[in-house]
Amino acid sequence: MKEFTADRKPLVVAPGAGRHVDFPGHAMEVLLDGGTTTGNVAFVELTVAPQSFGAPPHIHHDEDEYFYVLEGEVHILSENQIFAAQAGTLAALTRGYLHAFWNASNTPARMLVAIAPGTFGGFFDDVVAQLRKSGAKTAAEVTATIEQVAKRRNCEIYPDRVPDEAKPFLPR
């Protein structure tokens, strides 16, 4: 991935030219991260597999997230409301509010996620590095690792707030 220079020249990221991250449960490509945008924003494209969980209920204290559904449908929990977000839907999930997402359908869902500021984009790489270091394999070990890394980044995860309709899609 080409980085912005000190003079912040425009940057175009071609299809497939982002950084692929082997994050548990997602096909993920980091298109721009905080290092390429001087910390302002990160853009991540992710595919949520059919009938799978995307992210557990969590609260960011330092970032806002924006989900734009490109293909398929995801369900988004925002505080106590659940929305079926089809292609073309934009969800603005601001800091300080609980949110989660999952794919209850039989087809993959693809989303473009913007995170501001962009420094949280490194979270995904941090999780993968910690998983490799610890050798975590089970769903419980992976979940515990994600929770630890999230906590270091001022993001709280609330596994007890998973909606009943999303529980069948949790990793086992």
Regions found by a protein language model. Give the residues of each.
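Ligand-binding loop in jelly-roll beta-barrel domains
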Residues: 37-39, 75, 95-121
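Tight coil/turn sites that cap or link beta-strands
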Residues: 51-52, 88, 96, 106
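Structural motif
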Residues: 27, 66, 73-75, 82, ...
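A contiguous, mid-protein "functional segment" used to position or interact
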Residues: 107-158
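A short, N-terminal "cap"/entry segment at the start of jelly-roll beta-barrel domains
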Residues: 1-42, 137-172
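Short acidic-glycine-tyrosine-enriched beta hairpin
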Residues: 14, 75, 80-98
